[in-house]
C-alpha cells in the first residue's frame, strides 16, 4: 500500500496514527517507511505531503484491513485531519523460483 496525503490538523491525525499500528498488525501488515519530504526525480506528477508505505502478506489481508470496522471508525480521524491524494493497493510480484 502506498498513501500520499497532506496533514492539515495534526491533533486529529495523531489520534489516527496511534490507533493505526495495532490494526495493521491485526491483519499481518508491516510498516515500511514514512517521508514528509520525498523527491520526484523524474516525471511531471510531483508528489507533495506525506508518503507512507506499508504492506500485507496478500491482497486478501489488505482488503480485510480496509474493510475492518475498527479501521473504518479510526480512519474518520485521518479523513478529518488530512487531505488524501491517494491510498493505492499495489499488487506484489509472485514468488520467483
Where are these regions (language model features)?
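Short S/T/G/P-rich N-terminal loop/turn motif that feeds into the first structured element of a domain
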Residues: 1-69, 91-97
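A short linear hydrophobic-aromatic micro-motif
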Residues: 30-32, 74-75, 86-89
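C-terminal structural segments of small proteins and small subunits
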Residues: 62-63, 70-83
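C-terminal end-helix/capping segment
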Residues: 79-97
Amino acid at each position: 500500500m502506498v498513501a500520499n496525503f497532506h496533514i492539515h490538523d495534526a491533533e486529529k491525525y495523531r489520534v489516527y496514527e496511534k490507533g493505526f499500528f495495532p490494526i495493521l498488525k491485526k491483519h499481518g501488515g508491516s510498516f515500511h517507511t514514512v517521508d514528509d519530504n520525498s523527491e520526484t526525480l523524474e516525471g511531471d506528477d510531483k508528489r507533495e505531503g506525506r508518503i507512507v508505505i506499508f504492506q500485507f502478506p496478500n491482497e486478501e489481508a489488505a482488503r480485510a484491513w480496509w474493510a475492518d470496522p475498527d479501521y473504518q471508525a479510526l480512519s474518520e480521524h485521518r479523513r478529518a485531519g488530512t487531505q488524501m491524494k491517494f491510498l493505492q493497493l499495489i499488487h506484489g510480484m509472485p514468488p520467483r523460483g
